Amino acid sequence: MKVTLIAILTCAAVLVLHTTAAEELKTESQLMEVGMPDTELATVDEERLFKCSVSCEIEKESNKDCKKKKCKGGWKCKFNMCVKV
């Protein structure tokens, strides 16, 4: 009786884990289809970081504070980097 109960509980646990993993994969695949590919996102982030760093360095040479307005679209310049607000 104990062996049967253990076997049933083990199968139930495996089924739950398998179902959860399948749902996560489905969600990930849907997210990847909707948005931009990761490589394009990385390129956009690198461009924002570069523009912000360059503009901050130019302003620092002139003894001015970094303007927070250089980064757009929900980003702000902080520590010479564009960070998501």
Swiss-Prot record:
Report the protein name in the record.
U4-theraphotoxin-Hhn1ad
Disulfides per UniProt: 52-66, 56-77, 71-82
The superkingdom of the source organism is Eukaryota
Disulfide bond: present as a keyword of the record?
A: yes
> SUPFAM superfamilies of this UniProt entry?
omega toxin-like
Tissue specificity is: Expressed by the venom gland.
Give the signal peptide range.
1-22
Function summary: Postsynaptic neurotoxin.
Show the GO cellular component annotation of the record.
extracellular region; host cell postsynaptic membrane
Query: Which sequence ranges are marked TM in the entry?
Result: none
Which family is annotated? Belongs to the neurotoxin 12 (Hwtx-2) family. 02 (Hwtx-2) subfamily.
One family name in Pfam for this protein: Toxin_20
Instruction: Give the organism, scientific name.
Output: Cyriopagopus hainanus
- Which parts of this protein are propeptide? 23-48
What is the annotated localization of this protein? Answer: Secreted
Q: Which PROSITE patterns match?
A: HWTX_2 (PS60022)
- InterPro entries this protein is in? Hwtx-2-like (IPR012625)
